[in-house]
């Protein structure tokens, strides 16, 4: 399957433009600060992250490096998870807006990684991406109303058709 251009950053910016009251930087910078300072993990998070680092992330050394415990070993409840790369990324997005992600150094890294691993997302694809507001898809399932994202991201094929 071909991956789609990540839309979260432009989507959040669109929502902020339409509904936001605080400055963009004030909304996004706390995420950078949390990633920089880290947070204490629960038993559930520590166990799940240790399992993923030990198994699911093994084919992806950069993910193991980002989420693995420094010095190796399993995460435990009470350990602090610090994500310096995420902090740097979120800080750039907070300061420079979505363009930091789509046309700046973050986009350069995404395009470079895609090219190195046979992906098909280019810097031009990232630069051209625009978030769009669309009406949700609605249907019923077992008597419940189900609301989902419209195409291209939808669960309609499995539930609403």
Role assignments for model-derived ranges:
Residues 1-161:
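Feature marks proteins synthesized as precursors that undergo proteolytic processing into two chains
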């Amino acid at each position: 399957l071909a991956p789609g251009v990540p839309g979260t950053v432009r989507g959040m910016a669109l929502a902020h433009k339409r509904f936001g009251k605080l400055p963009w930087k004030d909304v996004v910078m706390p995420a950078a600060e949390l990633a920089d300072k880290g947070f204490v993990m629960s038993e559930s998070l520590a166990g799940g992250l240790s399992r993923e680092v030990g198994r699911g992330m093994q084919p992806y050394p950069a993910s193991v490096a980002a989420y693995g415990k420094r010095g190796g070993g399993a995460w435990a409840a009470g350990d602090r998870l610090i994500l310096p790369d995420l902090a740097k990324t979120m800080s750039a997005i907070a300061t420079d807006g979505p363009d930091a992600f789509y046309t700046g150094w973050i986009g350069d890294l995404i395009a470079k990684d895609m090219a190195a691993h046979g992906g098909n997302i280019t810097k031009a694809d990232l630069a051209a991406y625009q978030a769009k507001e669309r009406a949700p898809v609605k249907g019923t399932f077992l008597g419940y109303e189900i609301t989902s994202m419209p195409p291209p991201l939808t669960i309609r094929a499995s539930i609403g058709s």
